[in-house]
């Protein structure tokens, strides 16, 4: 009976450790995905701003020609 209790305890303990490791890996994966998504959003904002520069330059040059 003592052997069965020890075996059951060992199985439960190892299962708990395995579950904890899986949850930690899942959390790390989600954090990496969130960081990558944030980077993509920042790059798209930068591209949008860089795309507006030629428009702003042409508007300024048109205004300077008028004045």
Curated annotation (Swiss-Prot):
Function statement: Antibacterial peptide with moderate activity against the Gram-positive bacteria (S.aureus ATCC 25923, MIC=25 uM), but not against all other bacteria (both Gram-positive and Gram-negative) tested. Does not show activity against fungi, and against Leishmania species. It adopts an alpha-helical structure with very low amphipathicity in membrane environments.
Leftover remarks: The primary structure of this peptide is identical to that of Medusin-PH from Phyllomedusa hypochondrialis (AC L0P402).
Sites of Leucine amide modification: 66
Record-level GO BP terms: defense response to bacterium; innate immune response
Family under the similarity heading: Belongs to the frog skin active peptide (FSAP) family. Medusin subfamily.
InterPro entries: Frog_antimicrobial_propeptide (IPR004275)
GO cellular component: extracellular region; membrane; other organism cell membrane
Tissue-specificity statement: Expressed by the skin glands.
Domain of life: Eukaryota
Proregion positions: 23-48
Signal peptide: 1-22
Bias type Acidic residues, positions: 31-40
UniProt source species: Phyllomedusa sauvagei (Sauvage's leaf frog)
Region (Disordered): 26-47
Protein name: Medusin-S1
Statement: the UniProt record of this protein carries the keyword Secreted: yes
Subcellular location: Secreted; Target cell membrane
Keyword set includes Transmembrane helix: no
Pfam families named among the record's database cross-references: FSAP_sig_propep
Disulfide bond positions: none
Entry keyword set: Amidation, Amphibian defense peptide, Antibiotic, Antimicrobial, Cleavage on pair of basic residues, Immunity, Innate immunity, Membrane, Secreted, Signal, Target cell membrane, Target membrane
